[in-house]
């Protein structure tokens, strides 16, 4: 028995019908091994050794693979024809070697095919090769890079920016693009401008529209007319002018078809034309590739969908040209096949473009046999494939220049018509941001023909900010920058949404506050690693590894040395400095240009500033604790410390010193913020004495003496000079206080409560008691105001 292993049951089912009884086709159900999500899965100090585990989910499938492999005379590894597929095959081979004690590599045969057809499968089985270690190493390097970034940068994020979930090597760069576009939009200042339209009638009374372009030989620029008065004055002048056709220019323009689909262009066009997300597009394309039931049989309808190559096989081109000639006629067929070259930065072009496996499977014939969305995507791929080998579209363009009698004013009218529809017969590509109006036909015009002015219309416009990224335009931008690969685009977009860093509204990406915090932090403290050129450079290095031009562990070492140094440096960075930088970077976004927006809306005297709490970032009033206003800046955050204290976050356990008995005093971070701790906790049932860090107190300013005083609270500072009762100073939920005869009296911010004198305390007590007495009603009109606290305190009698 010869064992064939593929990734999915659907693929196995389709392939099985093309092979004889001597073959058994089984599925691995995707990856069988991966780096576990824990520390130590990649060990840089051990030459980047990688510790793979068989996932719990894959366990039963691995058992079946091992069992069948024991009976097999050879194993055909028929996973997808890219780096990831090569990696899956390598992992399967490694597990079989380990479990079945297979020593010879000849036992394994790697077969790769770009489409699941009988011809392609048979050819692959008859022409096996060995596993390509270069491709495997490139995929291992990518996985190691992603792991090292994720498992070193993410924990640092948790410590420095509570509430932020993770950072990834490529996702962070995509997030930066979205955030920077939002910054552009926020800072954009709209400007007013005007243009003038002329509604004209030719000698046959046929209406057309022209636009004013010149005044006294001066070309009108975008901002030549900037207000209503200028526009109206000019409109009045034009009403008295007589115009004629000064010049007519005619020319033809050829429009060439777009290349066949690659992964990114398929995702972009499916988003524009069908409204599919990148993830949905790839899920459907995967099914169309692996095989779908079309009634009489299960077949793979399209070629492999993860590709950046734009070439088509000679056989495919021949079949496409035959169909064009048969169904559309020879005038739609170019004299020779069209050949395309990729414009994608760092394109691998190892595979064909995405095309139907059999161009004679006409979409309309399959409409009733395919699920609705499957049909839509297949039709899109089929039409694009046909169109890419069809004749050009030919456009007739007409430009008419209109002039006033003395040529003081010139206007222009443009028109276009399709002289030959060419590939438009089958397919027309969409664009992201289409103009409001396309060129229209002009009526017949002759030079020197006199025209009638029907209407002069001043049009007001305002400049608009750049549009937010759609899925299509973001994928296009990533592709242009050379960031990511065909297999990663959909995942990048999904991860950003899953982690609540961005939302997709009206098919446009909007960054959440959490995403902006992460981006500001990374740009400020890891700028090199979120630079577009650097990330594209890493992709290029992975390509060089795949081509055997670069040793993969050497590439990992070059990256890790600098990145790890950066991590260590930021780890030592003071949280106050980080908060200060983040606030400065987000200042315009949070407060805008109006300085009054920083004024606390509650107390009207304090100033709002950024704080970080256990649930993330929030704004707090500088008058805390007198003013307890705070507001989360993270949308959807219900736990925004609205009833807690505004705190900075301390990230390290720090020893401040020892007391007289030699016990160490610690500054630590807890779930509710920084605190002081007396000694180590040696018994899990007995907690050492602790004291929260007062709000507004910078943890870097805490001294041993201050810490000891905090731990001694509540502290007796003396006895009241009149009543003889003890006076205590403490610190609680609402800040520092004086405790006197069962009453709690807040200590204003202007006092240093840790060094409060008895005289100051007595003054605050008296003010408080007088305030209480003043608020008491006196319905009996008594001569003496009753002392509500204690009769031992003497009070003056009021006059009747």
From Swiss-Prot:
Q: Which residues form the Toprim domain?
A: 1-111
For activity, the cofactor(s) needed are: Mg(2+)
Q: Which GO terms describe its molecular function?
A: DNA binding; DNA topoisomerase type I (single strand cut, ATP-independent) activity; zinc ion binding
Q: Where are the zinc fingers (C4-type)?
A: 600-627
Q: What is its EC number?
A: 5.6.2.1
Enumerate the active-site residues: 304
Topo IA-type catalytic domain segment(s)? 132-568
What superkingdom does the record give? Bacteria
- Which InterPro entries does the annotation name? Topo_IA, Topo_IA_2, Topo_IA_AS, Topo_IA_cen, Topo_IA_cen_sub1, Topo_IA_cen_sub2, Topo_IA_cen_sub3, Topo_IA_core_domain
Q: Where is this site: Interaction with DNA?
A: 31, 142-143, 146, 158, 306, 499
Q: Which NCBIfam families match?
A: topA_bact
Biological function = Releases the supercoiling and torsional tension of DNA, which is introduced during the DNA replication and transcription, by transiently cleaving and rejoining one strand of the DNA duplex. Introduces a single-strand break via transesterification at a target site in duplex DNA. The scissile phosphodiester is attacked by the catalytic tyrosine of the enzyme, resulting in the formation of a DNA-(5'-phosphotyrosyl)-enzyme intermediate and the expulsion of a 3'-OH DNA strand. The free DNA strand then undergoes passage around the unbroken strand, thus removing DNA supercoils.
User: What is the recorded name of this protein?
Assistant: DNA topoisomerase 1
């Amino acid at each position: 028995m010869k064992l064939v292993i593929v990734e999915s049951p659907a693929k196995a089912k389709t392939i099985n019908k093309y092979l004889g009884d001597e073959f058994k086709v089984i599925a691995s159900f995707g990856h069988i091994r991966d780096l576990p999500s824990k520390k130590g899965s990649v060990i840089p100090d051990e030459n980047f050794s990688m510790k793979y585990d068989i996932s719990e989910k894959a366990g039963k499938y691995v058992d079946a693979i091992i069992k069948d492999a024991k009976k097999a005379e050879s194993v055909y590894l028929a996973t997808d024809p890219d780096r990831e597929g090569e990696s899956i095959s390598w992992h399967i081979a490694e597990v079989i070697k380990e479990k079945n004690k297979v020593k010879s590599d000849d036992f394994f045969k790697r077969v790769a095919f770009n489409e699941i057809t009988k011809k392609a499968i048979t050819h692959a089985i008859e022409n096996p090769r060995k596993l390509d270690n270069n491709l495997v190493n490139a995929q291992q390097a990518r996985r190691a890079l992603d792991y090292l970034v994720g498992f070193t940068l993410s924990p640092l994020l948790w410590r420095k920016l509570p509430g932020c979930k993770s950072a990834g090597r490529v996702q962070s760069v995509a997030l930066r693009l979205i955030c920077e576009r939002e910054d552009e939009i926020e800072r954009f200042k709209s400007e007013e401008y005007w243009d003038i339209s002329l509604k004209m009638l030719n000698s046959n009374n046929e209406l057309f529209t022209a636009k004013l372009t010149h005044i006294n030989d001066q070309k009108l620029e975008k901002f030549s007319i900037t207000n209503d008065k200028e526009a109206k004055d000019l409109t009045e002048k034009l009403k008295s002018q007589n115009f004629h056709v000064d010049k007519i220019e005619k020319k033809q323009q050829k429009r060439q078809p777009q290349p066949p689909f690659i992964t990114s262009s398929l995702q972009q066009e499916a988003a524009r034309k069908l409204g599919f997300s990148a993830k949905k597009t790839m899920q459907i394309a995967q099914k169309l590739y692996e095989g779908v039931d079309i009634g009489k049989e299960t077949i793979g309808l399209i070629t492999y969908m993860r590709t950046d190559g734009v070439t088509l096989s000679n056989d495919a081109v021949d079949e496409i040209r035959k169909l064009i000639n048969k169904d559309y006629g020879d005038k739609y067929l170019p004299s020779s096949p069209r050949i395309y070259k990729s414009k994608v930065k760092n394109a691998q072009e190892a595979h064909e473009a995405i095309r139907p496996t059999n161009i004679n499977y006409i979409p309309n014939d399959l409409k009733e046999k395919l699920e609705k969305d499957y049909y839509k995507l297949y039709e899109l791929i089929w039409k694009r494939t046909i169109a890419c080998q069809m004749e050009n579209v030919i456009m007739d363009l007409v430009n008419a220049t209109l002039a006033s009698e003395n040529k003081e004013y010139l206007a222009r009218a443009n028109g276009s018509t399709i002289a030959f529809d060419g590939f438009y017969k089958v397919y027309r590509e969409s664009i992201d941001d289409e103009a409001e109006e396309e060129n229209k036909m002009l009526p017949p015009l002759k030079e020197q023909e006199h025209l009638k002015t029907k209407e002069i219309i001043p049009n007001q416009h305002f400049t608009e900010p750049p549009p937010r990224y759609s899925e299509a335009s973001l994928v296009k931008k990533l592709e242009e920058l050379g960031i990511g690969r065909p297999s990663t685009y959909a995942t990048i977009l999904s991860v950003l949404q899953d982690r609540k860093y961005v939302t997709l509204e009206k098919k446009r990406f909007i960054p959440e506050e959490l995403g902006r915090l992460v981006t500001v932090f990374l740009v400020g403290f890891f700028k090199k690693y979120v630079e577009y050129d650097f990330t594209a450079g890493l992709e290029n290095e992975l390509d060089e590894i795949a081509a055997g031009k670069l040793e993969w562990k050497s590439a990992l070492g070059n990256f890790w040395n600098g990145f790890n140094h950066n991590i260590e440096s930021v780890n030592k960075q003071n949280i106050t400095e980080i908060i200060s930088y983040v606030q400065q970077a987000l200042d315009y976004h949070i407060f805008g240009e109006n300085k009054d927006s920083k004024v606390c809306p509650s107390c009207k005297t304090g100033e709002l500033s950024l704080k970080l709490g256990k649930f993330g970032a929030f704004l707090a009033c500088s008058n805390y604790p007198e003013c307890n206003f705070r507001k989360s800046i993270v949308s959807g955050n219900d736990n925004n410390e609205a009833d807690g204290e505004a705190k900075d976050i301390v990230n390290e356990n720090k020893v401040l010193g020892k007391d007289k008995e030699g016990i160490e005093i610690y500054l630590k971070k807890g779930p509710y913020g920084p605190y002081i701790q007396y000694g180590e906790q040696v018994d899990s049932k007995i907690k050492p004495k602790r004291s929260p860090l007062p709000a507004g107190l910078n943890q870097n300013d805490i001294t041993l003496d201050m810490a000891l005083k905090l731990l001694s609270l509540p502290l007796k500072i003396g006895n009241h000079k009149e009543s003889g009762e003890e006076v205590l100073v403490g610190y609680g939920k609402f800040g520092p206080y004086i405790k006197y005869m069962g009453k709690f009296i807040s200590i204003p911010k202007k006092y240093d409560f840790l060094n409060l004198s008895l005289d100051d305390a007595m003054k605050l007590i008296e003010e408080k008691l007088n305030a209480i007495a003043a608020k008491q009603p006196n319905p009996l009109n008594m001569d003496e105001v009753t002392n509500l606290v204690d009769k031992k305190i003497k009070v003056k009698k009021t006059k009747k």
